[in-house]
Swiss-Prot record:
A Pfam family of this chain: DUF5391
Designated gene of the protein: yxaJ
Subcellular location per the Swiss-Prot or TrEMBL entry: Cell membrane
GO cellular component entries: plasma membrane
Species for this entry: Bacillus subtilis (strain 168)
Protein name: Uncharacterized protein YxaJ
Amino acid sequence: MSKKNSVAIMTTISAFLFCAVIVAASLSPLAGTGAAANQFNSAGMWSAVGMILVLYFIPFLVYMLGVDAMRYVMAVLCGFGLLIHLSSAGFILMFSFFSDHLLSEVIFVLGVSLAAAAVNVIWFVAAFRSGAEKTSVNTLT
């Protein structure tokens, strides 16, 4: 599979999981943590999902049109996403330990957040692996 296809697949999965974190958090007790928290199916939740999709789609579209340097812009955004998902996972753990809510009430959000962080790490591997690491079927060494 080509590097561009790998990046496209991982970017799509990453965008889906980022949106899933927002939706899952709005369905969990985390939705009641403050005035800025999104309730499920609210305008705030949909605007957050829309903003994430726009922030994924624009650099992805430019990259797919052939601007290979956009991979570095996407890497910075992926790094921000990794930071967001890992800090969200830490916040969710702290929330469950120091509130009246059990870990079982937020475990799905925690799992999706950690899965999104793992996908972002895999995205870096897919985007920046070297061509020398690929094994060829035709070599007889």
